[in-house]
Amino acid sequence: RTLCIVVDTYQVNLVESKEILEKCGKVAVIDHHRKGVGFIENPALVCHEPYSSSASELVTELLQYVGERDDKPNRVEAEGLLAGIMLDTRDFTLHTGVRTFEAAAALRRYGAETERVRQLFDVTMVEYNAKADLVEAAQMYKNCAVSVSGEVPPEARVAIAQAANDLLTIQNVEASFVAVQVGTGVNISARSLGAVNVQVIMELSLIHISEPT
């Protein structure tokens, strides 16, 4: 009878715990990424909106139609959702629509404060230095900024996505790819201003890597 709600991904390989997913009798999927391979099989419910700015936007929309006022997000939860929207839209500058701002307004009504949300993005000196090193290592390839690096400190892995975001602010950069060694694997963060479909590129890269040589 347990319901497992998977948010911000539809792929089995990207969930936090495959064991929990497999043990739950019912699964609901809430995601905004373009549908590709590896979709979770036979979900009881799917909320899939590729044109939505973020999974946080979708969750906020759903919460407005569920339960009574007491069931709505508290201030901390609302600020977490607003942080998700701000992260995926780069502070409402990318991939935004009318529904994005309506969701943000709803979260504001639930008590979210942008000042406190902004503080959630503060970084340590270790994280900042790791991000700076990744940005400095980037090279240009066909209007794409590409950075490849060895391992970064485990506590600074958030710098991988942050570096990919920062590379988009460089003139003439339409997409960014930051690849960092993590143990025996590679963590890749890809970002785009819209002209380059980085999700398709990443999917093709995974297919190529998995093919026998």
Residue ranges and their predicted role:
Residues 16-19, 46-50, 71, 136, ...:
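A generic local secondary-structure boundary/capping motif
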Residues 1, 87-210:
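Hydrophobic helix-and-loop "lid/oligomerization" segment in the mid-to-C-terminal part
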Residues 1-23:
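N-terminal small/polar loop signature for handling phosphorylated ligands or for N-terminal nucleophile
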Residues 32-105:
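Short alpha-helices
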Residues 5, 26-30, 45-48, 145, ...:
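Hydrophobic/aromatic beta-strand patches that form the interior of the parallel beta-sheet core
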Residues 22-24, 40-43, 205:
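Short, structured coil segments at secondary-structure junctions
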Residues 9-12, 33-35, 152:
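Short glycine-rich anion-binding loops that position phosphate/pyrophosphate groups of nucleotides
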